[in-house]
Every structure is written in structure tokens, then in C-alpha cells.
């Protein structure tokens, strides 16, 4: 799958744009250290944007009927994404909770795969959080879903306000976790517990 996406980008166009960008900032793209930079950067972006054109919901290929009606939480799913405003990375961890409906559960790795697909594109953290929750709701129709994403944004660290170490936390809730503050708080406390 990765190889397929890497080959689907317009490699020549991406390399030409990076070459022109180097010229625009006053660099010589033909000097020794930069000779292969357009090719390397185009390849890197192809990898970083592997999620483009994919639906995170499609990652939920394994759905099982189990006798489990209590909350399922997967914490600390590491991810890297790219801020669509500045095209610099933001990275962090996603925490996902869902309350199965009729015992419908998914393979735990499928949650991590959905995060991977949703994060591998120019993205906003708020949208990333919602896309993960929506994919889970569409795939499993759980009684409740809660997604929390914590991330450090290089656009706040490297430029502008320059506040390294600051984290942005976004949450989104669906179903029972949206309707019941007490249920939501209980799940958040489990997500944030070490």
C-alpha cells in the first residue's frame, strides 16, 4: 500500500517545485549539499501524505462480536502530521475510547491504523480529532466515542510565538460521551491516568 501511494504522486512536479523553492529563498539547488534535496524532499512528502485519498474508516477491517459491553480505551497512539497552514509538522499522541454497542469491537491495531491514515495529510488537529471519532462511529456504531489528541505544533515552536513544549489538546465526543458529562469525565480521567 505504501509503495502504491509513493508512486502515485507527481514526482517530477514535486521535485521541480522544491528546486524552485530553494532558488526563491536564495539557495543554489545545484550545490553539492542540495543536489539531491528536491528528490529527497519529494519522497519524504509522499511518505508524510500517505493518508491522502484514504478514508480512516476503511482501516476497521476486523470487527468482532464479543460479550464485552464496557469501555475500550487505547492510549498513547503516537502520530506525526503536517499543519496545513504552515506545512510544518505537529506530533503527539491520540487516545481513543469507545463503548461497544451489541458487543461489536474491533482489533486494537485498527484504531492505531485509523489515526495513521487521518494524520498522514495536511491537517488541522481539530479536524484530525473529529475524523478519528467519525471513522470509529461509522465503522462500529458504538454507544459512545471519545477521542483526545495531544500535540506539539512546530508552527508554535519554531516560528511566531516560539513556545517550545506547549501542547494543544483537542477532544471530541459522540453518543453517550457527548450526552453525559459524568460518563465523559470518567473516560477522560482514565485516558489521562498514568
From Swiss-Prot:
SUPFAM superfamilies, per the entry: Tetrahydrobiopterin biosynthesis enzymes-like (SSF55620)
The keyword Transport belongs to this UniProt entry's keyword annotation: no
Chain positions recorded as Zn(2+) binding sites: 83, 86, 155
InterPro entries according to UniProt: GTP-CH-I_C/QueF, GTP-CH-I_N, GTP_CycHdrlase_I, GTP_CycHdrlase_I_CS, GTP_CycHdrlase_I_dom
Annotated catalysed reactions: GTP + H2O = 7,8-dihydroneopterin 3'-triphosphate + formate + H(+)
One Pfam family here: GTP_cyclohydroI
MF term (GO), any: GTP binding
Matching PROSITE patterns: GTP_CYCLOHYDROL_1_1 (PS00859), GTP_CYCLOHYDROL_1_2 (PS00860)
EC number: 3.5.4.16
Alphabetically ordered keywords of this record: GTP-binding, Hydrolase, Metal-binding, Nucleotide-binding, One-carbon metabolism, Zinc
Broadest EC class assigned to this enzyme: hydrolase
GO CC entries: cytoplasm
Any single GO BP term: one-carbon metabolic process
Subunit (UniProt): Toroid-shaped homodecamer, composed of two pentamers of five dimers.
Entry-linked PANTHER family: GTP CYCLOHYDROLASE 1 (PTHR11109:SF7), GTP CYCLOHYDROLASE I (PTHR11109)
Name listed for the protein in its UniProt record: GTP cyclohydrolase 1
Species this protein is from: Streptococcus pyogenes serotype M3 (strain ATCC BAA-595 / MGAS315)
Lineage: Bacteria, Bacillati, Bacillota, Bacilli, Lactobacillales
